[in-house]
Amino acid sequence: MQAPRLCTQPLPLCVAALYQFCPLGDCAALREVLTRVCRLQGVRGTLLLAREGINGTIAGSQPGIDAVLEQIRAIPGCAQLEVKLSSATTMPFHRMKVRIRPEIVTMGQPDIDPLLSAGTYVVPHDWNALIADPATVVIDTRNDFEVAVGTFAGAVDPQTRSFSDFPAWFRAHRDALLDGKTKVAMFCTGGIRCEKSTAFLRAEGVSEVYHLKGGILKYLDDVAPADSLWRGECFVFDQRVAVGHGLAPGTHSQCHACGTPVSPQDLQSAQYEDGVSCPACHATRTDEQRAAYRERHRQEALATAQGRVHVGAVLPVRPASPR
């Protein structure tokens, strides 16, 4: 079988991060429709479908992305689809996947309905005032490896490995978190996790719950660096790895062995070997594993030099694409 060619779409490419909570009917039929239109338009990425809605990130030419978004907005309940657009100089995905899941972002709380009980939206230009209020506790709802790349000044890091760990973390730390605080402000990459986390806190009896509308990506796009309270870069679930203000490409890369974001400082570590290990996973690798990773890296480099995509070159990104 001939290996797929590298992307030949006009540059820069358009990247669309999207989600919508709405009741979906026949997800299997919808998967076929979306797979067909994405392939027809040369669009790649991942779309997740569940009875509660749609979530994903896709990339392609501007006309191609427009066509896919038009198809999604035609789905009943998706007319107000939440979309954040950015650009990329190389295709950030190897293939197109449309998958059916129990949840479009996994929290493991089946009784939570963001359509009925999500918190109050705060637009990016009002966010600084809210999180600077001494009565506000600010919580980063993302996972530990994302927070390590960047977060808001003064935000609480739950140090969770998965979003499904968040409910137990909040219940265990509730009293300390809310001590002397009357407001809770939460944020995530694109807003979808906060739809559920704010609904969860309201179900737990917390009344004043707020979340950043459009997430970190919208904040970085709207707020000037001179006015920003963001520190670092924002991890994204594609091959760009991280973005900064204006959604410009960040300085982080990614370990091909474990998927951990790698900073420029990490690249200088004696434990970093391109395609083989990084400071986060070096101690856990056997000699046999290192040899296998080196061979895979050699094959990937050869394929790239020949203008091909190595079929095994899928980065082991940790949990797939919440936002």
Could you say what each language-model-derived stretch is?
Residues 2-118, 142-184, 192-323:
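Rhodanese-like catalytic fold shared by cysteine-dependent sulfurtransferases
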Residues 83, 124-125:
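Short alpha-helical segments and helix-capping/turn motifs at coil-helix boundaries
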Residues 115, 119-123, 130-131:
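A conserved helix-loop-strand patch within extracytoplasmic ligand-binding domains
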